[in-house]
């Protein structure tokens, strides 16, 4: 698989499928609901070609902006995107640790700095909103969240209610449009 210069929705869908990241059956999701399909972020985030395509697509959308990734899932995404885009990044922990620096935000971040949050899969948007709020609490300006896959289950609306625009590389509709398994 060649890495396209400016990956399209179709390129990203193909990369996710080639990484076997789309699975079918009955799955429990992190918010407690169930689904007939599952997008295995660990399969696409550990596949070098898929990760490069995703990072290139994110980099095409990023200006002179600091990136943020939510630990643990979005760390590979933000690290590779940072390298492709040539932009710095920070990692947002779910909560501050009681050891080391005790920081919730890891990396360099200045007050009033513009930050774009990268997320793997958006379902309800809760983890993205929590990351946005943690960044805002330390003085960052956060108005955008980029996700690889929007499951179209309320994340966009929850983010909009927090004055954040969400942009997805692909939606569940894009990913499952030709699939008879769902």
Curated annotation (Swiss-Prot):
SUPFAM superfamilies: PRTase-like. One of its GO terms (molecular function) is orotate phosphoribosyltransferase activity. InterPro entries: OPRT, Or_phspho_trans_dom, PRibTrfase_dom, PRTase-like. Orotate binds at residues 123, 151. Its EC number is 2.4.2.10. It holds the Pfam family Pribosyltran. It comes from the Archaea. Disulfide bonds: none annotated. The keyword Magnesium applies. It is an enzyme of class 2 (transferase). GO terms for biological process: 'de novo' UMP biosynthetic process; pyrimidine nucleobase biosynthetic process. Keywords: Glycosyltransferase, Magnesium, Pyrimidine biosynthesis, Transferase. Gene3D superfamilies: 3.40.50.2020. It catalyses: orotidine 5'-phosphate + diphosphate = orotate + 5-phospho-alpha-D-ribose 1-diphosphate. Pathway: Pyrimidine metabolism; UMP biosynthesis via de novo pathway; UMP from orotate: step 1/2. Its cofactor is Mg(2+). 5-phospho-alpha-D-ribose 1-diphosphate binds at residues 93-94, 97, 119-127. Belongs to the purine/pyrimidine phosphoribosyltransferase family. PyrE subfamily. Catalyzes the transfer of a ribosyl phosphate group from 5-phosphoribose 1-diphosphate to orotate, leading to the formation of orotidine monophosphate (OMP). NCBIfam families: pyrE. Homodimer. This is Orotate phosphoribosyltransferase. It comes from Haloquadratum walsbyi (strain DSM 16790 / HBSQ001). The gene is pyrE.
């Amino acid at each position: 698989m060649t890495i396209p210069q400016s990956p399209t929705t179709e390129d990203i869908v193909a990369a996710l499928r080639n990484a076997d990241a789309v699975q079918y059956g009955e799955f429990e999701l992190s918010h407690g609901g169930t689904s007939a399909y599952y997008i295995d972020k660990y399969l696409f985030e550990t596949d070098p070609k898929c990760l490069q395509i995703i990072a290139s697509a994110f980099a095409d959308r990023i200006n002179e902006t600091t990136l943020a990734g939510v630990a643990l899932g979005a760390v590979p995404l933000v690290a590779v995107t940072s390298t492709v885009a040539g932009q710095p990044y920070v990692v947002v922990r779910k909560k501050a640790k009681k050891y080391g620096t005790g920081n919730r935000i890891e990396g360099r971040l200045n007050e009033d700095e513009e930050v774009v949050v990268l997320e793997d899969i958006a379902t309800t948007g809760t983890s993205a909103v929590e990351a946005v709020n943690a960044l805002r609490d330390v003085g960052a300006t956060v108005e955008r969240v980029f996700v690889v896959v929007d499951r179209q289950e309320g994340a966009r609306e929850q983010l909009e209610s927090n004055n954040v625009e969400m942009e997805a590389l692909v939606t569940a509709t894009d990913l499952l449009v030709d699939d008879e398994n769902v």
